[in-house]
Amino acid sequence: MKKSGSGKRGPPDGNHQSVAPEKVGWVRKFCGKGIFREIWKNRYVVLKGDQLYVSEKEVKDEKNSQEVFDLSDYEKCEELRKSKSRSKKNHSKFTLARCRQPGTTAPNLIFLAVSPEEKESWINALSSAITRAKNRILDEVTVEEDSYLAHPTRDRAKIQHSRRPPTRGHLMAVASTSTSDGMLTLDLIQEEDPSPEEPASCAESFRVDLDKSVAQLAGSRRRADSDRIRPSSHRASSLSRPWERPDKGAPYTPQALKKLPSTEKSRCASLEEILSQRDTAPAHPLHLQAEESPAPVPSQPGQLSRIQDLVARKLEKTQELLAEVQGLGDGKWKAKDPPRSPPDSQSEQLLLETERLLGEASSNWSQAKRVLQEVRELRDLYRQMDLQTPDSHLRQTSQHSQYRKSLM
């Protein structure tokens, strides 16, 4: 029988002959269709390396094979099964699909194994061989040293870049994003070796920009503080108290920021140090004098609990007075001896005393309830203020302590 010229891919090299075959066996190969049925012929197949040898009879030397196929020309090996066929051959067919690249002349191969287990074995072996053949082509690619890409900036001379001072826009952006407590540090460090061209003018312009930015930041902080004080004072004035005298208050006038001389400025300053002058400046807080202060404004839950205990004791005392007055009245009116009953003047005095005690008790009761309600409202107000400005509350405690005490 003549050898197939289309399937021949060249004589195998010495490396392939030295390698033991991975899989050998008899399978049936599809050779075309006849008039009535398909033509299947028994073939002896040897898988060695990335070559597949097919011959009509069992041979010891692969050179005597009629057909040799290079597995690098094939894409995959998979099972071939028809959807509506009930034949036993349908469970043992597998195919080698060629690559869909232009110029590929390798044919599609269809085989029929002896059993489905043998079919799976051939599929696994051929798939591994195809993968190795593809990788072998990639491994053979070599790159010469002359073809390396030259790095455009590796050998470039390095230039020492000096640090420029921050601009006014950068300082304003940092100041606008800073926190309310002013603990953010502004980096104002200049280089040790400034540019030889007009160093004094550069330093003077930098100081002027710094003074302007600090003055604007301090003014915005004072406006924010005055806005926080205004709703609290309005809230305190809305509370109705008979002993309150709002006409004797003095308005709060914030002092202007004292500009620091240029000799006292450090090269690295923080907002806390710059704005410390506002805390030390004299201020005139609002004083509200009261004839009587039942309890101080609570700043902690412990003080609120003490005020509640005081109110409870007042209530107990009032109840005791009421019980005592009621007992005295019952004892006087239920006396068995009519001649020993008190005269009209004594009964009137007793009634007056009882009315006075009841009036005091009711006034104490209403005053205690009013104080407790005001304390709760003030507590809610300070909680809202603390939620809005949690960081600035501690700094304003020392400045407005007298104002908070005078609210009661």
Curated annotation (Swiss-Prot):
A cellular component annotation (GO) from this entry: cytoplasm
Residue ranges of every copy of the PH domain listed in the record: 20-131
Pfam families reported for this sequence: PH (PF00169)
Region (Disordered): 1-20, 217-265, 389-408
InterPro entries for the chain: PH-like_dom_sf, PH_domain, PKHO1/2
Post-translational modification: C-terminal fragments could be released during apoptosis via caspase-3-dependent cleavage.
Keywords: Cell membrane, Cytoplasm, Membrane, Nucleus, Phosphoprotein, Tumor suppressor
GO biological process: lamellipodium morphogenesis; myoblast fusion; myoblast migration; regulation of cell shape; regulation of myoblast fusion
Region (Interaction with capping proteins (CPs)): 132-192
Site entry (Interacts with capping protein), positions: R154, R156
Membrane topology: Peripheral membrane protein
Feature type site, description Cleavage: D309, L310, D344, S345
Region Negative regulator of AP-1 activity: start-end pairs: 307-408
Bias (Polar residues): 389-401
Superkingdom of this protein's organism: Eukaryota
Subcellular location: Cell membrane; Nucleus; Cytoplasm
Modification type Phosphoserine: residues: S226, S270, S341
Region (Interaction with ATM, CKIP, IFP35 and NMI): 135-307
Job description of the protein: Plays a role in the regulation of the actin cytoskeleton through its interactions with actin capping protein (CP). May function to target CK2 to the plasma membrane thereby serving as an adapter to facilitate the phosphorylation of CP by protein kinase 2 (CK2). Appears to target ATM to the plasma membrane. Also implicated in PI3K-regulated muscle differentiation, the regulation of AP-1 activity (plasma membrane bound AP-1 regulator that translocates to the nucleus) and the promotion of apoptosis induced by tumor necrosis factor TNF.
Subunit structure: Heterodimer or homodimer. Interacts with CK2 and actin capping subunits (capping protein CP-alpha and CP-beta). CKIP1 and CK2 together inhibit the activity of actin capping protein at the barbed ends of actin filaments. Interacts with ATM, IFP35, JUN, JUND, NMI and PI3K. Interacts with AKT1, AKT2 and AKT3 (each isozyme of PKB), PtdIns(3,5)P2, PtdIns(4,5)P2 and PtdIns(3,4,5)P2.
PANTHER family in the cross-refs: PH DOMAIN-CONTAINING PROTEIN (PTHR15871), PLECKSTRIN HOMOLOGY DOMAIN-CONTAINING FAMILY O MEMBER 1 (PTHR15871:SF1)
Protein name in the entry: Pleckstrin homology domain-containing family O member 1
Record organism: Rattus norvegicus
Biological classification of the source: Eukaryota, Metazoa, Chordata, Craniata, Vertebrata
